[in-house]
Amino acid sequence: MSLTRLLIKDFRNIENADLALSPGFNFLVGANGSGKTSVLEAIYTLGHGRAFRSLQPGRVIRHEQEAFVLHGRLQSEERETSIGLTKDKQGDSKVRIDGTDGHKIAELAHLMPMQLITPEGFTLLNGGPKYRRAFLDWGCFHNEAGFFTAWSNLKRLLKQRNAALRQVSRYEQLRPWDKELIPLAEQISTWRAEYSSAIAQDMADTCQQFLPEFSLTFSFQRGWEKETDYADVLERSFERDRMLTYTAHGPHKADFRIRADGAPVEDTLSRGQLKLLMCALRLAQGEFLTRESGRRCLYLIDDFASELDDARRGLLASRLKATQSQVFVSAISAEHVIDMSDENSKMFTVEKGKITD
């Protein structure tokens, strides 16, 4: 599925934009601060309900406006789908699909699977475990129909359990929460483990092409001891959890560890190599989705040229073209992306929030 039309109103520095898009490569060229990243962020927000540079809605709404409006048309082989998102300064959202309101943001995420590659995306590799959990959970969300509901219920129960830890004196008082929490935790951990195992070879093959000088390994850590029943862990950890006032073990503490030649990648790779690894992981994940479900990702790449030499840019471009997916690329200069262009590409110039093609 590709995004054939994008309408943006009062988002960042963009007052109004109506873009007819290519199903292949779309290039956004402009100086720093021109608004080219804002276009990528508008697409991301349309599919996620939130921006990738700010979690506060007021910061992405254009100055002195009350809300932003995003609208898109998605085209698949079978049909066209109309989608829309409005969000005000209080964070209240309205999702519209095919002309009807009342839809959930998760429905937009399902319709628009996308991979984001930005200069800030290094957190996948050198940030905390939550970023790598999010990487796995993206795959589980798009591969397991029940994942989102289970994950949402897990978050709710953990919040309730942590609140209860401040009030209880005996473990038996927590059993009502743990009775619901334990099967959810085990199911989510099983899905994550299965997904990480299924995609491991895809990641290894892609990483070998991008970083042949390293031997990369991947390991899933579920968030509590191996070969240990989660129910036993919760009961055994009760006094410590009560003292900390939060649940110290569980799927919310899981990690997906990535090593190069046996050492953590953040201690071994240069910034350029980290960017290559990030690109390889995002590509592998998108290609795995296509192979398993027949659905293609949208790829959003901000500041394409940074950290990469000509050869590596060429490799990334050729791999992206091979996916036959829709790709959005921002760059300061057209010279950085002209080699990627073909007869099906579109080049947009962005200047002070105005977009022309």
Curated annotation (Swiss-Prot):
InterPro entries: DNA-binding_RecF (IPR001238), DNA-binding_RecF_CS (IPR018078), P-loop_NTPase (IPR027417), RecF/RecN/SMC_N (IPR003395), RecF_2 (IPR042174). It is found in: Cytoplasm. Its main location: cytoplasm. One of its GO terms (cellular component) is cytoplasm. It holds the Pfam family SMC_N. One of its GO terms (biological process) is double-strand break repair. ATP binds at G30, A31, N32, G33, S34, G35, K36, T37. Disulfide bonds: none annotated. GO terms for molecular function: ATP binding; single-stranded DNA binding. Keywords: ATP-binding, Cytoplasm, DNA damage, DNA repair, DNA replication, DNA-binding, Nucleotide-binding, SOS response. Belongs to the RecF family. The RecF protein is involved in DNA metabolism; it is required for DNA replication and normal SOS inducibility. RecF binds preferentially to single-stranded, linear DNA. It also seems to bind ATP. This is DNA replication and repair protein RecF. It comes from Salmonella typhimurium (strain LT2 / SGSC1412 / ATCC 700720).
